[in-house]
Amino acid sequence: PPYSIVWVYPKGTKSQIKSRIRELDALGVEGISFQGELQVDTISILGKGYAGIVVLGKMGRKKVAVKIRRNDSPRKNLEKEAVLLKIINKHKIGPKLIASSKNFLVMEYLDGEKVGDWVDGLKKNGNSSQLKLIIKKVLEDCYSLDRIGLDHGELSNLSKHVIVGKKTTIIDFESSSMDRKVSNVTSATQAFCIGSRISKIIGRVYKIPKKQKMITVLRRYKHEGTRESFENLLAVLKL
């Protein structure tokens, strides 16, 4: 069947496909529906990274996001990502992990749009107070991640890694690590405010401080990592 590629993307055997379908059944996922803005072959999906692809699933009456490990992934399983998700979920960050196995993560489905698209929609007369709330929420979550020593790893390309909706949160923790220096707050602040595509749009909606001032407060935060130096950053950003 044409959809079978999804289970073993980019390619795999019939027995691998059968085994993965059984594995997903065992997690309690009752159905998959192929929709979303991305495509593999001609199949619509929610997301695609180098470790997995994400599709929409159903558990009872609940929509879920199902991450399927890519067959060509250097990772032998998704267990490390599941462990990290459990840790950040305790701090109310990320999509809630519902179930996991070797090749699957079942997470709450977050209805919303990627922050890059959301910012695009603001145009010139966007709502600056709403924008500030979103930036503050993301930076607060980044501060929490810094405190627990978990580095997201991809926040310099923020546009794709935050969902804005009823629940605004950071997503895609497949490159995360607790074994390297954290730079969540600095990466996200730079993405929002310094020289990225979205920073140009944000700059039209509300006045971002001068680059040199930003670099100074970020340096202080990087050096101290304290709540006070973080509050100082928020104050400079007028958040």
Q: What residues fall within each predicted segment?
A:
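Juxta-kinase regulatory segment immediately upstream of eukaryotic protein kinase catalytic domains
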Residues: 1-43, 233-238
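ATP-binding glycine-rich loop module of kinase domains
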Residues: 28-80, 86
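Active-site beta-strand termini and strand-to-loop segments that position acidic
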Residues: 56-60, 108-109, 164-166
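A conserved alpha-helical element in kinase catalytic cores
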Residues: 67-101, 133, 192, 196
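Conserved structural core of kinase catalytic domains
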Residues: 93-135
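Protein kinase catalytic-loop region centered on the HRD/HxD motif
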Residues: 140-151
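C-lobe/activation-segment region of protein kinase-like
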Residues: 150-154, 165-239
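Hydrophobic residue at the +6 position relative to the catalytic HRD Asp in the kinase catalytic loop
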Residues: 158-164
